[in-house]
């Protein structure tokens, strides 16, 4: 699955988790359709943050399914993600969707792939989309060699990815998960 046109980055720090996403929507290899799309949003009363890469229509379908799983499992991110992945693998319609989700709460960051994978990074940093490798590398370097908070790392890493990846811009949506009371 070749995903073009976006970068989504999650960074967990001492104060919680932040997900940042750029706003560019690209049609094919050469047409920028929109600069200010929102590909990151809060779910489950603000306790979960999610972003997507891939087809917009497919991603919204997956968001709806994931949000339903979150409600069904009372906000348990890992359980909802595993159940979502099972559904994704079994359902003939969902299997054809070309999108990936990056979901996080203050304890876990998970990548949900179209193959039904649920992957949790070891270092609390994950990225998806065409600019994902650049954002991931920049975020890891910043996390290892600075005292910056998660949001600052996410913003700066996304800025760097936007300088390198032509499918990523600097119009960011940045959301942080709320701490449970």
UniProtKB/Swiss-Prot annotation:
PROSITE patterns: PROTEASOME_BETA_2. The active site is at 6. Na(+) binds at residues 162, 165, 168. Keywords: Allosteric enzyme, Cytoplasm, Hydrolase, Metal-binding, Protease, Sodium, Threonine protease. It is found in: Cytoplasm. GO terms for cellular component: HslUV protease complex; proteasome core complex. Its EC number is 3.4.25.2. It catalyses: ATP-dependent cleavage of peptide bonds with broad specificity. Coiled coil: none annotated. GO terms for molecular function: metal ion binding; threonine-type endopeptidase activity. It comes from the Bacteria. A double ring-shaped homohexamer of HslV is capped on each side by a ring-shaped HslU homohexamer. The assembly of the HslU/HslV complex is dependent on binding of ATP. Belongs to the peptidase T1B family. HslV subfamily. Protease subunit of a proteasome-like degradation complex believed to be a general protein degrading machinery. This is ATP-dependent protease subunit HslV. It comes from Nitratidesulfovibrio vulgaris (strain ATCC 29579 / DSM 644 / CCUG 34227 / NCIMB 8303 / VKM B-1760 / Hildenborough) (Desulfovibrio vulgaris).
